[in-house]
Amino acid sequence: MKLAYWMYAGPAHIGTLRIASSFKNVHAIMHAPIGDDYFNVMRSMLSRERDFTPVTTSVVDRNVLARGSQEKVVDNIVRKDAEEHPDLIVLTPTCTSSILQEDLHNFVERAQLEAKGDVMLADVNHYRYNELQAADRTLDQIVQYYIEKARKRGELAEGKTAKPSVNIIGTTTLGFHNNHDCTELKRLMADLGIKVNTLIPEGASVNDLKKMSQAWFNLVPYRELGLTTARYLEEQFGTPYIDITPMGVVETARCIRKIQQVINAQGAEVDYENFINEQTLHVSQAAWFSRSIDCQNLTGKKAVVFGDNTHAAAITKILAREMGIHVVWAGTYCKYDAGWFREQVSEYCDEVLISEDHGEIGDAIARVEPSAIFGTQMERHVGKRLDIPCGVIAAPIHVQNFPIGYKPFMGYEGTNQITDLIYNSFTLGMEDHLLEIFGGHDTKEVITRGISADSDLNWTKDGQAELNKIPGFVRGKVKRNTEKFARDRGFKEINAEVLYAAKEAVGA
């Protein structure tokens, strides 16, 4: 455990609570001290949900520490069962309350005797797993619980559906554009003539889980969430799963062709090639845009990418393969699955970076000085500090990246949204230059703001005047190179002569 003021993936209990609050009529009891109970505020503030967050904190206070937690936790579970009538109550500790080493399995068994609904302990090691791993394991645990329960009662659905059908696994509350992706995936499946059997966990009932065995295949659009569940369903029912993320023109087509292969192997006779061609040429604007003069202006520009495995890998491929942009490095904070990420992106970028340290990522960005950054909320902050534009492509994110308008990243409409995001993230040089020539609302001070708040060098009046003559879209880079040149040679202030010398020395 380490103290950090920024984490890319939160602690394990956040993952468990995301899964529990994604299902309909499921309540979570969090056994935790005050301070660990920020999930309710975070969810209601960020994801703009209409419903109250179904999470209750069973507070660990001094009375609990003196007498033990069992009585309080059991009372809270039974009370919520009577008040809310949930189908399932999930009990989760946090990494703080796990220190108490209490027998929470026993608490659940005691509560189950009095509760009318089901009660379950989210069995996750809070010191070994992060938010994403815990979410994946909790979803798998809930699915297994209800399938085994249905099997014991003889309620498990037999056989497959008459027409091709799919379980879409992994869309959750607080996910990056998950609601929009979910709508786009349902639309895509309808276009392909495939019925959505279940969509879990977002908006699903735990009572729907017993019919998951009827699907022809499982689709896992997000690498981080749903793979464990899909593997369990394959093991139990022989249901094949597809884990190709349909993001970008090429990967969406590859996903559709894999679906065709999987359902044809089970007796269907479909050919989706005409559909792929129609969508690629006429519905998605991305393929046309990639051949336009606008996109050619981006060819060879430098970019860096950082995020979770799913989004960082997909955006890296789109930038390099579909838009001709030079990805200097691509990175992920999913250290536990680094091998997969390397395999996916190594041929599309110069360097692969695996790190959970935002400081290291910020330094790597400053080192290569890209034309644009594609990352999380933290990379947006880094970009503002360095005066480099940033497109947000992965969680963790702030409220502006939970858009009310329709902005999927998946499917063919997703390709349009991603293309817009990428193109608009690059600073258009003439725009900056014209503002300088003709003025506007921007003041000279705003346009020439420093790239670093803690610069130890002074610019003289003639040095600053000379710097201001340089077009805005390259001024930041010239300033950084000049300051580096001055530090290396021990100058305390930068005048016009130093600027000229730096330009000659480093080609700034």
Curated annotation (Swiss-Prot):
Pfam family, one: Oxidored_nitro
Binding of substrate, residues: G429, M430
Top-level lineage group: Bacteria
Cofactor: [4Fe-4S] cluster
Entry annotated with the keyword Heme: no
Cofactor: record remark: Binds 1 [4Fe-4S] cluster per heterodimer. The cluster is bound at the heterodimer interface by residues from both subunits.
GO molecular function, one term: metal ion binding
UniProt enzyme class: oxidoreductase
Entry keywords, A to Z: 4Fe-4S, ATP-binding, Chlorophyll biosynthesis, Iron, Iron-sulfur, Metal-binding, Nucleotide-binding, Oxidoreductase, Photosynthesis
Enzyme Commission number, as recorded: 1.3.7.7
GO BP annotation list: light-independent chlorophyll biosynthetic process; photosynthesis, dark reaction
Subunit structure: Protochlorophyllide reductase is composed of three subunits; ChlL, ChlN and ChlB. Forms a heterotetramer of two ChlB and two ChlN subunits.
Official protein name in the record: Light-independent protochlorophyllide reductase subunit B
Organism, scientific name: Nostoc punctiforme (strain ATCC 29133 / PCC 73102)
Gene name of this polypeptide: chlB
